[in-house]
Structure formats: C-alpha cells, structure tokens
UniProtKB/Swiss-Prot annotation:
Pfam families given in the database record: DUF7024, Sulfatase
EC number: 2.7.8.20
Keyword Membrane: yes
Protein family per UniProt: Belongs to the OpgB family.
GO cellular component terms attached to this protein's record: plasma membrane
EC class (word): transferase
One Gene Ontology term of the molecular function aspect: phosphatidylglycerol-membrane-oligosaccharide glycerophosphotransferase activity
Protein name stated in the entry: Phosphoglycerol transferase I
Any one of the GO BP annotations: glucan biosynthetic process
Length: 763
C-alpha cells in the first residue's frame, strides 16, 4: 500500500510542477532534488533486492560506504551498469518534464504544493522507511529488556546419549519444498522431511540473513551484529568470546565436534567462529584437497556437494565405529546464488520451470538429492539409532534465477529433525526463527531449552511468538548484542606479531591487514575481506579529521607518504588524519610495539583532497620508481604506459590471466632501446611448462621456455622499428581456481611473472 501511495504522490508532484508551477530556478532545483531522491531511494531498493533478496538491510548499509567485491560479483556488473545508465536517463527525463512550461510565470502555491507532495512521496516510500530504521539501529543505546530475554544455558548436557549430524543447506529454504508451487523439485529430501519433525514457520530476522550470520544465530541464539561488517569476521581472532554456544556445550559434555564444507574455512571467519566455540576438527577446501578422490573437481566456491557429503559420510562412519560421542556439522554450497552448481553424480541435473530450464532450481534439485543420499546412508547404518539428524537452511535464498518465483510464496527457512532413537513424524506450525534452532537441538539432546535469544520449539516460546514486531525488536537489541563482543573503546598502545600476522591492542587481537578509525570513546575496526573494498579505498571515505591507524603492506601506503618503501612487501603502520599529518613506520621487528600519536593540527583541505584522490587510484594505474617491473606489488614502473592480460599481485608475483587478455601486453611510454636484453624471472603453469612461449617486440620474436619453478632467462632483442610494446603469449592457458578469490570465476593461468627488466646493450 505504501508503495502505491508513494508513487501516487511522486506522480502528482511531477504533474503539478510541470503544468502549473511555472519558471523559478530555486523551486525547480528544490523539487528536482527531492524527486531525484525518491528515484535514487527506489533504485537503491531495487538494486538491494537484486543483491540480497531482502531489501535494504545491514549488508547494504555497509556496502553503501564500501565496495561489493568478492563472490560472484562479475555476474552483477551488467545489472550495475544498467542501473547507473537507467538512473542517468530518469534524471534527464525528469528535468526535461519539470521544465516543460518554464516560460510561464512562477506560481508560489503550486510550487509549494509540488514540493510538499515530493517530500511526502519520499517519506512514504518503503526504501526511506527501511533506511530510517537501519540508521536508528546504528544510533540506539539498546533496549532495557534485552537482559530479561537473553539467557545463558547450562554449560553441559547432564547425560548425553545421542550423536548429532547437523546439515546446513546453502540457501535451501523451505519454500523449495512446496510441491504445489514447484512440482517434483525436492522429492528425495522432501520425503525425509515428511518423516521427521518439520518446523514449517522458521522466519528470517535481521542479522541472520547470510551464511556466517545464520550459523551464529542457529548455534548461539543471537543475530550476527558486530562492530564491523559480518562477512569481515575472518580478521578477528575470537568470535563472541564471552558467549556460550551449542558447540561449547557439546564439547563440555564430552562431544568431539567436527565441521566439513567444500569452501575455504577462512571465508567470513567460519574457522574463527567454530574454533572459538568448541570445534577442534575443521575441514574446508584446503584440508580436503589432499584426501578427496578428485582434487580438481571443484566449482567457484570449492568442492561440489557430492564430494563434501561423501567425506562427511566417511567421517560419520569413522566416528561411529570409534564409539566416541561426536557432532558432525556440514555445509553445502551448490545452491549458492546467483546460479548454483550441478554435481556430476546426481541424477537430477535439470529442472524446467515456466517451460524453460532454470539453473537455480536445477541446482536445488541436484543438491537435495545429494543430501538425501547422505541421510539415507546414515539411516541404513547400525548407528542411526544413536543419532539425531538436523537439516536446515543457513538463510533464505538471495537473488538467484528462482528468486522471483520464490517471492510469490510465503517464504520460510528450512528446519527439520530426524531422530534415530525416537522416530517422530509431525509438522509443527509454531512461529519461530533461526535463533531457535540451537535451543531446539539442545533440548532434544537433553540440555536446556534456551540458548541466548533462542528457545526450544518443543518446550519453549519463541521470540517470534512473544513479539509481533520481532524484526524491529531484533534491531532494537543490536547495540546490546554488539556489546557482547566486549570490544575495546580506546587504543593507546599496540603490538604487531609478524609471524602470526596479528595486531593486538586493549586485549583484542585482529589479523592483518587492518584499518582502524579511532575516536575518544570508540575504536572501529575495518578489516579487509572478500566483500569489502581494499583498505585504502575504505580510508578514502574517512572525514578529514578522523584519526586512523592503518596496518598494511608498505607499498600500499608508500605512494602517499613513504615513496622509499614503494617496493617493500613488509608490514608498515600509518597513522594520522587525511586532512592533517600522517606518519609511516616500517615494522622491522618480529614483535613490534607502537603507540598512537594523533596531533590536533589545522586541517588542510587541499591535502585531504590529494590524499583521497591518491588512495582511490586503481591498482593498474599506480606507478613507482624502479628499473624493472616488480610483479608482487601493485602498479608498474613509471616507464610503463599501460599493461593487460595480467592478474592481481600475489606474495610471489603475478599470473598471466587469459580471462583479461589472450596475451601479456606491456606498453612503454617511449620506444624500447635499439638493442636490449630482456631479463625475465618467471615460471609456467600446468601444460605451459617446457613449451615454447613466444615473446615479441615489434617484428622480432624470441622463444621463452619455463618450468614449474621460478627461473631467470635472458632474451636478446634488436628493435630497429622503435617498437614500444612487449608481448608474451602463453601457449595453453589453463582454467583453474588455484589461488583464486573465493566465489570468483576461474582464472586462465599461463605464466607466473616475478620480474621483467629491460637492459640496454651497447652497439
């Protein structure tokens, strides 16, 4: 209803101003600004829905001040460009319409009415309401009743008798199991769901709407609200360190806790969370690659679900035979947005909807078959009678190719339980949320029936039942939940441990690199993650007087304040204000101690603008003084005009990447010498080893042969035509996820370059 009212007010404002208000520059500018705000808000809502499937939420608020990089982002580039172009077109059209009768005399009454209607359209828009609520949630002090509802359970289960298998289905919400809406989509897992305790109304709350947040909610009974963006949790050394979570209780009760997934454990700090709360045995893509049957059988995120669930079954067998009490948690990935992935062993590889194949539905149908196969193995085993199996979604599906069809349904998260000791077949329609999952499992295992804000759906009353406005209530509790981190409010001294790549201050520890905004009563950590912008881009958003401490590789800050360190990959510490003074210190000891030293100086806005502009220079446009191209730092020597076909810097150098260009091309600002030696320090990837690699300068071509290890080769060139471009053509680029950023499409690697140097020859 509010959408219709908002649009009606917008349309009325446009028509009244265009046809009645007449000519006045001030009223035109004011009305266009407010109407433009309406357009921006609604496009933001549309774009947010596209990325999150949940409107403007905490993740979007973070992204508005940073950058969305990371998982699958390349698939969103075209929609993003479309939104920008559409916004420009709408603004242009809006300005043209409002000035249709600019030659008519100004009418104050109609101008005022049009402006008021425009303001009303903004106020009534859902986007404005969502942003207002989010901003309020950032500034609240908390809610006094939080302590009454947040309850810590007993740290042990008195007499545990059952093992636990807990399966997180990536984005595998219960909506997919509606056979009327999506016929025969989930027959195998749906049949198992109907054999157990099926909780049909598990809603999603703020702070529980992405994987690590859903895991925290289901195991600790609280949303993931933190003093930093949730997916940046990989940078912290401990996770809600004061809280008691399901894993802690299981460990204290004699359980050995295991976690198995196909993706890298470091992503979003799942390893930190699990290690902080009772899990001693973790298996992700790095740990599994040496034990799986086919280490090359991977998707963009890691190993396929069939591989992961096969390993989970092996672990279940091994642990069951040992006779020890255990919990085995596993997380699938094949149903990850935007398209999903199809395991090669499943029979259900294709699902048509609306008369055409749908990749997301196909991935769901395949993944549920793999999960069902795993569960049926457990059910057929002699150990099932001592086992509780839990299947849940980590969160509702985000914007995938099935999302518009899901949105036509009443959407809920998946949560069902199959008990080997006491078979129960029932659908429970009680209102609940993800935070109740852990408490329900704890209750079944013989522990308390509460866990944080979660309550057992078998013997307690969910917050979703107590509060009709549970989403608003959850946001009201956000400051209280953030305080559970016990995060420090000041930073005076700090220590950097180079061996561990950690910084410590005021009792807190963070992985490097790290950016901190330091004020009188608050220290705000801004880690670097797959979903956040590089730290220098985040620093560029600081105000001129904001105090900062930035710990990163020296070369990243050298272009601003320490050019002598432009080629150093050591750690450096920079601190100060962007509009004031900055210092850079080289971390030259294994354990390096520093102090914050912020001076109250006069702010220089010209200096501030220069710093911001330099921080925002993209990597490929950075230039440094050097007599060779050093590939393990960003940018290129000053003599290089541009380059292409080269991937990002890594600790050792850079790979060529045929996704960015079939050949490595380095164009210099001036012609290369008439005679020169080209000294190349490099290695080859895969089948490119021991193969002739053409290297061209102008009309002359030499051959380079590389092995799998780094070697240095000198090629002799004559350049009578004054060519200015060096071209290297890897013969057989290999598509691989090796060394890739999690969730990105595979790179096509050819050669790995450490250094290229042009040495002029006499004669």
């Amino acid at each position: 209803m509010s959408e219709l009212l908002s649009f009606a007010l917008f349309l009325a404002s446009v028509l009244i101003y265009a046809w009645k208000a007449g000519r006045n520059t001030w009223w035109f500018a004011a009305t266009l600004t407010v109407l433009g705000l309406f357009v921006v808000l609604n496009i933001t809502l549309f774009a947010s829905d596209y990325f999150t499937g949940d409107g403007i939420n905490d993740a979007v608020l973070y992204t508005l001040t940073n950058s969305l990089t990371g998982a699958g982002v390349s698939k969103y580039i075209l929609p993003g460009i479309g939104i920008v172009l559409g916004l420009a077109a709408v603004f242009g059209a809006l300005g043209w319409i409002l000035r249709r009768r600019r030659h008519h005399p100004h009418h104050f009454g109609y101008s005022l009415l049009a402006l008021l209607l425009a303001l009303g359209s903004v106020d009534a828009s859902p986007a404005f309401r969502q942003i207002t609520e989010l901003v309020k949630s950032q500034s609240r002090d908390g809610d006094p009743d939080f302590a009454a509802y947040y309850k810590e359970p007993s740290r042990t289960i008195p007499d545990p008798k059952l093992n636990l298998v807990y399966i997180y289905g990536e984005s595998l919400e219960r909506t997919y199991f509606d056979n009327e809406a999506f016929p025969d989509l989930t027959p195998e897992l749906g049949a198992l769901k109907n054999e157990g305790l099926d909780f049909s109304h598990t809603q999603q709350l703020p702070g529980t709407d992405y994987t690590i947040a859903g895991m925290v909610a289901s195991q600790c009974g609280i949303p993931l609200f933190a003093p930093f963006e949730g997916n940046a949790s990989a940078s912290v050394s401990s996770f809600f360190p004061q809280n008691i979570c399901l894993g802690d209780i299981l460990k204290n009760s004699g359980y050995q806790n295991y976690f198995v997934q196909g993706a890298n454990l470091r992503f979003a700090g799942k390893d930190v969370f699990l290690k902080s709360h009772g899990f001693d045995h973790l298996y992700g893509s790095e740990e599994l690659k040496s034990v799986v049957a086919d280490p090359h059988y991977r998707n963009d995120w890691g190993f396929y679900d069939d591989t992961v669930l096969d390993e989970a079954w092996k672990k279940f067998e091994e642990l069951s035979r040992s006779g020890q009490r255990f919990s085995l948690f596993t997380l699938t990935v094949d149903t990850h947005h935007p398209d999903g992935f199809i395991s090669r062993t499943c029979n259900r590889k294709k699902y048509d909807f609306d008369g055409k194949p749908n990749q997301s539905f196909s991935a769901v149908s395949c993944s549920q078959e793999n999960i069902a196969t795993f569960i049926n193995k457990i059910k057929a085993s002699p150990w099932f009678k001592d086992t509780v199996i839990v299947v849940s979604s980590d969160h509702l599906a985000m914007n995938n190719t099935a999302w518009k069809y899901l949105n036509k349904q009443d959407r809920n998260n998946l949560f069902f339980v199959i008990r080997g000791d006491k078979p129960q077949q029932e659908t429970l329609a009680v209102k609940r949320n993800t935070m109740d999952n852990g408490a329900t499992v704890l209750d079944i295992l013989g522990g308390d029936n509460y866990l944080g804000l979660g309550r057992s759906s078998l013997s307690g009353q969910s917050m979703s039942e107590i509060f009709l406005n549970i989403k608003e209530k959850t946001l009201a509790w956000k400051p209280d939940i953030i305080r559970l981190w016990k995060f420090p409010k000041e930073m005076k001294e700090f220590t950097i441990d180079q061996q561990k790549n950690m910084i410590a201050f005021s009792g807190s520890h963070f992985r490097l690199p790290l950016l901190l905004r330091v004020s009188d009563k608050r220290v705000e950590p801004l880690p670097e993650s797959e979903y956040s912008a590089p730290l220098r881009f985040q620093l560029a958003d600081f105000a001129p007087r904001d105090n900062f401490v930035w710990v990163d590789r020296c070369y990243k800050m050298a272009q601003l304040w320490a050019p002598e360190l432009a080629l150093s990959t050591d750690w450096c510490v920079s601190q100060g204000q962007l509009g004031g003074q900055q210092i850079v210190q080289h971390v030259d000891k294994a354990i390096w101690k520093g102090k914050t030293a912020f001076k109250d100086t006069v702010i220089d806005m010209a200096r501030y603008k220069g710093n911001v502009d330099t921080l925002k220079i993209v990597d490929n446009d950075i230039r440094y003084k050097a007599d060779s191209f050093i590939f393990n730092v960003a940018g290129a020597p000053e003599e290089v005009k541009q380059f292409s076909g080269i991937s990002r810097p890594e600790s050792w150098g850079r790979w060529s990447n045929a996704q960015l260009g079939d050949e490595v091309k380095i164009e210099y600002k001036h012609p290369l010498p008439k005679k020169f030696d080209l000294v190349i320090t490099a290695k080859a990837y895969g089948n490119n080893a021991s193969r002739p690699i053409p290297v061209r300068v102008g009309n002359e071509e030499q051959t380079l042969v590389l092995g799998n290890e780094v070697t240095t080769t000198t090629l002799h060139f004559d350049n009578p035509t004054d060519a200015d471009t060096l071209v290297i053509v890897p013969p057989e680029p290999v598509s691989t996820n090796e060394g890739n950023i999690l969730g990105h499409s595979p790179r096509k690697l050819g050669i790995g370059m450490v250094e290229i140097k042009v040495v002029e020859r006499e004669g």
